[in-house]
């Protein structure tokens, strides 16, 4: 499995390493390799596979916000459920790739979680952060 996490650059930046990583994502997808994306990784997967990422009109989204799992998702059953995610982003997915499934959204982030077939899963929120870690990052100026 592969994991792509956060970055200070944008998924739509025209940098050589981003272009190369998007090509790698397409190759992983073609070969049905497991891939998880978090924040920048979520956005980069969407961009690489035909979605769109833009700067959020509302600006930075920083904090803990409830996301709602969509009904009838293969992963989570038939009931809508809420869960909290820690967000720290100013870019967001505005159009999902054609073959993806929207799994969760929130008031502040319409595309909070995506799946593509059974091998790609991505989150806009930082599932790798706990609250104490996020507070520490905020205090030293690494968030927002």
Q: What do the PLM-derived regions correspond to, one by one?
A:
Residues 49-132:
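Pocket-forming structural segment of enzyme catalytic cores
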Residues 32-42, 88-94, 140-142:
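A short, terminal or domain-edge coil/loop segment
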Residues 14-17, 98, 134:
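Residues at alpha-helix caps and immediate loop-helix transition turns in enzyme cores, especially N-
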Residues 3-5:
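Structural motif
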Residues 7-73:
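Cysteine-nucleophile active-site neighborhood
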Residues 20-24, 101, 136:
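Alpha-helical elements of Rossmann-like donor-binding domains used by nucleotide-donor carbohydrate transfer enzymes
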Residues 129-144:
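Acyltransferase
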